[in-house]
């Protein structure tokens, strides 16, 4: 006797609008699951439909408030495991704690590894995420991890909205660590590549020391994975403007926007900022545009479900 395991998609509270778009792409309704709080603030998860023997895709970015959303995710995984789900694939569009992926100095924790351990022990059987800050985090897990790249989504949108002339445009990596990410975008758009050489005197503070590449009289596309406080991207834009950049467009997968980041962006040399909807925001300024990665994630889920290649999405 053979059984076809039904697929169901559920969402926590972190980014329900994105989860609804993903479910819509898959021609599914979001599963009925309540994630609330007890009187003392503890998280309460109630699954209101059967999931026994089903393949579950659970959508929950661990964005700010990071600890609240992470605990929601862990408790939801545990609830589905104890309800006898066949598989539990967690879709974490934004992976919190990803920047704590190594010991930068003595006695530092490696929190990204701890989070990976927690997700695995809770009962996840697969992880799907978007633009991990450090791709080696995939190796922190002993379960399959699919790290989706957002650059095709950005490239398609930029070609639609901006007058991109490859010979007059340059993609800029905001630091040496982001060169591979920026190179993918440059190859997609057919542009040249430049790099900002930065130094970090302290956390969330960066100083541009040198610009490697030609940016004078060019439209600059700064491409990064995260905008947090926006100190780095604003300082970078200022250096590029001083070097003769004609126009500055910033693209970042994850708009965290901590500590007056939006105010800094509004008052900066950046003309337009593009982010994705991995993190939910309301009432963003006119300068900030949101591109959805729902179809990208939805297609990846469909391919995983059908045992098809995910990597061919980026060829």
Curated annotation (Swiss-Prot):
Pathway membership: Metabolic intermediate biosynthesis; 5-phospho-alpha-D-ribose 1-diphosphate biosynthesis; 5-phospho-alpha-D-ribose 1-diphosphate from D-ribose 5-phosphate (route I): step 1/1
Cross-referenced CDD domains: PRTases_typeI
Where is this protein localized, as stated in its record?
Cytoplasm
Name the EC number(s): 2.7.6.1
The protein's UniProt keywords, in alphabetical order, are: ATP-binding, Cytoplasm, Kinase, Magnesium, Metal-binding, Nucleotide biosynthesis, Nucleotide-binding, Transferase
Q: Binding residues for Mg(2+) 2, per the UniProt record?
A: 175
Cofactor entry? Mg(2+)
Cofactor-binding details, from the entry: Binds 2 Mg(2+) ions per subunit.
PROSITE patterns, per database record: PRPP_SYNTHASE
* Family matches, as InterPro entries: PRib_PP_synth_CS, Pribosyltran_N, PRibTrfase_dom, PRTase-like, Rib-P_diPkinase, Rib-P_diPkinase_bac
Presence of the UniProt keyword Kinase in the record: yes
Q: Catalyzes what?
A: D-ribose 5-phosphate + ATP = 5-phospho-alpha-D-ribose 1-diphosphate + AMP + H(+)
Q: What is its main location?
A: cytoplasm
A Gene Ontology biological process term: ribonucleoside monophosphate biosynthetic process
Catalytic site positions: 198
Describe the family membership recorded for this protein in Swiss-Prot or TrEMBL.
Belongs to the ribose-phosphate pyrophosphokinase family. Class I subfamily.
Q: What does this protein do?
A: Involved in the biosynthesis of the central metabolite phospho-alpha-D-ribosyl-1-pyrophosphate (PRPP) via the transfer of pyrophosphoryl group from ATP to 1-hydroxyl of ribose-5-phosphate (Rib-5-P).
**Quaternary structure note:** Homohexamer.
According to UniProt, the name of this protein is: Ribose-phosphate pyrophosphokinase
Q: From what organism does this protein derive?
A: Thermotoga maritima (strain ATCC 43589 / DSM 3109 / JCM 10099 / NBRC 100826 / MSB8)
């Amino acid at each position: 006797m053979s059984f076809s395991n039904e697929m169901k998609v559920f969402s926590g509270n972190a980014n329900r609008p994105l989860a609804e778009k993903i479910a819509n792409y898959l021609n599914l309704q979001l599963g009925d699951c309540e994630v609330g709080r007890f009187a003392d603030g503890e998280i309460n998860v109630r699954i209101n439909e059967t999931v026994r023997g089903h393949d579950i895709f659970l959508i929950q970015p661990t964005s700010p408030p990071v600890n609240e959303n992470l605990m929601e995710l862990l408790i939801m995984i545990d609830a589905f495991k104890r309800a006898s789900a066949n598989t539990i694939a967690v879709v974490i569009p934004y992976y919190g704690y990803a920047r704590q992926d190594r010991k930068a100095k003595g006695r530092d924790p490696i929190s990204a590894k701890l989070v990976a351990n927690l997700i695995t022990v809770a009962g996840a059987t697969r992880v799907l995420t978007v633009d991990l800050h450090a791709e080696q985090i995939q190796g922190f897990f002993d379960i399959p991890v699919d790290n989706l790249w957002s650059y095709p989504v950005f490239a398609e949108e930029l070609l639609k909205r901006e007058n991109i002339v490859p010979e007059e445009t340059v993609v800029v990596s905001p630091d040496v660590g982001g060169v591979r990410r920026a190179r993918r975008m440059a190859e997609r758009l057919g542009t040249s590549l430049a790099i900002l050489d930065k130094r970090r005197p302290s956390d969330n503070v960066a100083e541009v020391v040198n610009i490697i590449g030609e940016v004078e009289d060019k439209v600059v596309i700064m491409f990064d994975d995260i905008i947090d406080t926006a100190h780095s991207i604003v300082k970078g834009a200022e250096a590029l403007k001083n070097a003769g950049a004609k126009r500055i467009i910033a693209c970042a997968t994850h708009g965290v926007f901590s500590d007056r980041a939006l105010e800094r962006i509004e008052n900066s040399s950046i003309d337009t900022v593009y982010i994705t909807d991995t993190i939910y925001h309301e009432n963003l300024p006119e300068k900030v545009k949101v591109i959805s990665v729902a179809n990208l994630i939805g297609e990846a889920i469909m391919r995983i479900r059908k045992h098809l290649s995910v990597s061919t999405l980026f060829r």
